Design a protein with these regions (language model features):
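Extracytoplasmic "Venus flytrap"
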Residues: 27-50, 54, 60-74, 84, ...
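Short, solvent-exposed amphipathic alpha-helices that sit
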Residues: 39-53, 133-137, 161-180, 198
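Hydrophobic alpha-helical
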Residues: 77, 85-105, 170, 188-247, ...
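Sec/Tat signal peptide C-region and signal peptidase I cleavage site
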Residues: 17-23
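Flexible loop/hinge segments that line or gate small-molecule binding clefts
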Residues: 94-132, 150, 241-254
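Hinge/cleft segment of the Venus flytrap/periplasmic-binding protein
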Residues: 25-26, 173, 271-341
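Short beta-strand elements in bilobed, periplasmic/extracellular small-molecule ligand-binding domains
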Residues: 51-65, 150-153, 174-192
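Hydrophobic alpha-helical segments within soluble ligand-binding/sensing domains
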Residues: 28, 72, 126-151, 165, ...
Length: 341
């Protein structure tokens, strides 16, 4: 009996070791549809860093290009053919890639949507709360405007799920301030050059406005005011390193940064690994709630000072990790290296 027990224990140990070895051979696919954007670049680096830090991922297969839902459908199907165990996707829109997601999950592939939601029920969603992101910033802005006047509404990419959700949040805040009106509404495409040209054109037109809400393309908006000598108005942006620095350094600027961590990509990889390890969460939707850091209150100034990081690209969010989800170091995300690189 004693010998049998020892044999069983040894067998259990071998089975356990085999399980660990198998866990270290996960292949994870990544699908992203926007390049040339600092937020998305940080997201990709967070995915790589988390995969490396986990010690459980053998390789990443990354489809990272500028495309639409049709192109992303093709990318996801290619990842399915490549034999990945999981796919982490930042969707082009909420329902445009549902068919490919369903094809993946029908084959037992775990699918996690990050940053913005999808409507396919077989997918897991780990997203920044985009509606609340817009609401917090817009409400603060309208209060700074004294509850009246004209706001410039600088949105993201037309048709993107995150932009649609942010529009709901912005309009929810707008409904609370009937004396605030939208002077101009533009889509920046989340591209810095495009947004800067748009605000320069608006400034040059000479139409008065009292505030600017941006969907995260922010530091170049401040640059446009400073370079043109235009009097500053309150500006809302995201927690991008450049804008966070400006909120502490640009004289006369009143503004607020709303957190929207690109590191949600790393959290999505962590969730995919957790599910592959047999530890799927009870709920398929996880929202990361934003926080507002303003430079008009002592508490806000302290938060901005603590978050500032001059070592990051100006376009990268300073929230480079998400407590309870990501496990990599600052050096690892900045290095932007995944398994085998």
């Amino acid at each position: 009996m004693k010998s049998l027990l020892l044999g069983s224990a040894a067998l259990s140990m071998l089975v356990g070791m085999a399980g660990i070895a198998a866990a270290q051979e996960y292949k994870i696919g990544i699908s992203n549809t926007v390049q040339g954007n600092g937020w998305r670049e940080e997201m990709i680096c967070a995915m790589k860093a988390e995969a490396l830090a986990s010690g459980k991922v053998a390789s990443l297969n990354i489809a990272h290009r500028n495309t639409d839902a049709a192109g992303q459908l093709e990318d996801i199907r290619n990842l399915i053919q490549a034999g990945v165990n999981a796919i982490v996707v930042n969707p082009a829109n909420a329902d445009g890639i549902n068919a490919a997601i369903k094809e993946a999950t029908d084959k037992g592939i775990v699918v996690v949507a990050v940053d913005q939601a999808v409507t396919e029920p077989s997918a897991y969603i780990l997203s920044n709360n985009q509606e609340q992101y817009a609401y917090l910033g817009a409400k603060w802005l309208f209060e700074q405007m004294g509850g009246k006047g004209t706001v410039i509404y600088m949105r993201g990419a037309a048709g993107a799920g995150a932009d649609n959700d942010r529009d709901k949040g912005f309009k929810r805040a707008l409904a609370e301030f009937p004396d605030v009106e939208v002077g101009q509404e533009v889509f920046t495409g989340w591209q810095q050059d495009q947004a800067k040209q748009q605000i320069n054109d608006i400034i040059a037109a000479g139409v008065p406005f009292e505030g600017v809400w941006t969907s995260g393309i922010d530091n170049v908006i401040v640059d446009a005011f400073v370079e043109s000598g235009t009097p500053l108005v309150p500006i809302v942006g995201a927690d991008n390193a450049g804008f966070v620095g400006q909120l502490s350094s640009v004289e006369g600027l009143k503004g607020a940064a709303v957190t929207n961590p690109g590191s949600v990509g790393g959290a999505g990889v962590a969730l995919a690994i957790q599910i592959l390890d047999g530890k799927a969460p009870e709920q398929k939707l996880v929202l990361v709630d934003p926080v507002l850091w303003d430079n008009t209150s002592d508490d806000g100034k302290a938060l901005l000072a603590g978050a500032a990081n001059p070592n990051l690209s100006p376009e990268w969010p300073v929230s480079v990790s998400i407590p309870g989800w990501t496990n990599y170091t600052m050096d690892q995300i900045i290095a932007c290296k995944g398994p085998g690189e």
